[in-house]
Amino acid sequence: MKSKRRDDIVQFCRENTLLVMTMFSVFLGVVLGFGLRPLNLSQETLQLINFPGEIFMQVLKMMILPLIFSSLISALAQMDAKESGQMGASTVLYYLSTAVLATILGIFLVTVIHPGDPSIKGTDISEAPSDGNVSPLDTFLDLVRNMFPENIIQATFERMQTTYVAIRPKIASKNGTSGNIIVKRSIGMTKGMNILGIIVFCTGFGIVISQLGERARIVVDFFVILDAVIMRWVVTLMWFAPLGITCLICGNLLELDDISDIASVLALYVFTVCAGLILHTIITVPLMYFFITRENPLPIFKGMIQAAVTAFGTASGGATLPMSMQCLEDHCGVDRRISRFVLPLGSTINMDGNALYEAVAVIFIAQLNNVQLSLAEVLTVSITATIASIGLGSVPAGLVSILLILNTVGLPVRDVSMLFTVDWLLDRVRTAVNVLGDAFAASMVQHLLQKKLDQADARHDYKTELKGEIELLKSAATSRRPSFTMSEASKELFLTHANTAGNSRIGSRIGSRRPSSTNLHLSWRNNNIEPPYTPLPNDENV
């Protein structure tokens, strides 16, 4: 029995080598991080420890843009425009529903557990940056503006964002004072890839290609092959994930400051957020999946383990996108046309973990300041957290989102810096939650559109055509029918008839297997010539 169990474990490790190595890298990173803290390593040493992880993250982020272009266009180009619209509407509706449910769950848990303790306010907490003029309307308008970039090339490295600039009047008042400072809204560009705008562009591009039909077949084939090449490259790069994840986690732990004074309060805060994220992942989302599909959600969890661990290690949904696609298609059986559309869109707007985290963080800060939020303010927090999680999902660490919600309900922003000490952990957990949510979304969308996908395959199935062509080539290569070449007697007979007819065009086609256009009934199947052709030495070659 023990020998069989050991053999099963060895077999599992062999079949899931990358998964085992990735999980071990997370454990190793935590052990090294806490084990090396007493050594008080220098900044140069910390920089060297973080260096492999930084390179790994840069390589993964490098693949985001070509992966989105190739996967989205290749998937939508093989679908009908009506089916693409239904898929997009279903996906967005699901993401909005789960974000609202996550926000409600977070507000409920933080109200019941009550992790905020006003007695620790005596602790010296550094001031956090403030952007008090940003409103939910600005966030929503920025979201829409970024959906339609004026320059698709610029969208690969910049996105639009509303800021408020303080302007001092140039003309002094009559009493000699300079007057009040005027705050003016400014719409500018900030660094960062505008993924939402790129997704909108690729979606339209792919739908137009699908409408062109056979005329755009060569373009479809190009993007399908490009997608396969990029995915093969990504699979190769993922073998460097264990080293990168170990260095990232170890470096983050070594850079933490001493948090012993507020450890108990922060521990309860972390417990509240993690409890909400876990409940949302194992109860809310699976229940929605079961009610819609009537299928067991456990295979989705099992198939996405590798992607979830990678998301926890990298703390980046975009960097995990290639691994998510591979797990969803290979282990969960989701159609690539669905996964290549839903996952890139989900990495931008599906931020259930962020919505829950932001709602808990805002009410936690209110509890620290002994502020009792009214029902209207709680509703404001829930709505703003949902909008901010979608519109500002790509902002690192959720800083702007939390500041936005705090200013909406009039809470102080100085306590946000306290949350940074544990945000490295919560960021990884909520990223894993978002990745799993994307997987369930893709599975549910496939269930809803399965009949339409089958109908599309029946109308025009590239895979079946390609398979048929391959089988035809195989049958030709294995055919026992002998190949022929023209004998000397046949050549002489052919030249005699050609000279008699005086047709120079026929003379230029000596050796052709096509039938002549004259009265000469000479072809490779002519049985009147004895023997017209002789077999080649190797009759197996085509």
UniProtKB/Swiss-Prot annotation:
Residues 1-15 are cytoplasmic. The keyword Transport applies. It comes from the Eukaryota. The chain crosses the membrane at residues 16-36, 55-75, 93-113, 192-212, 234-254, 265-285, 303-323, 386-406. GO terms for molecular function: glutamate:sodium symporter activity; L-glutamate transmembrane transporter activity; neutral L-amino acid transmembrane transporter activity. The keyword S-adenosyl-L-methionine does not apply. It is a multi-pass membrane protein. Residues 505-542 are annotated as: Disordered. Disulfide bonds: none annotated. Glycans are attached at N175. GO terms for cellular component: plasma membrane. Residues 114-191 are extracellular. It is found in: Membrane. Belongs to the dicarboxylate/amino acid:cation symporter (DAACS) (TC 2.A.23) family. This is Putative sodium-dependent excitatory amino acid transporter glt-6. It comes from Caenorhabditis elegans. The gene is glt-6.
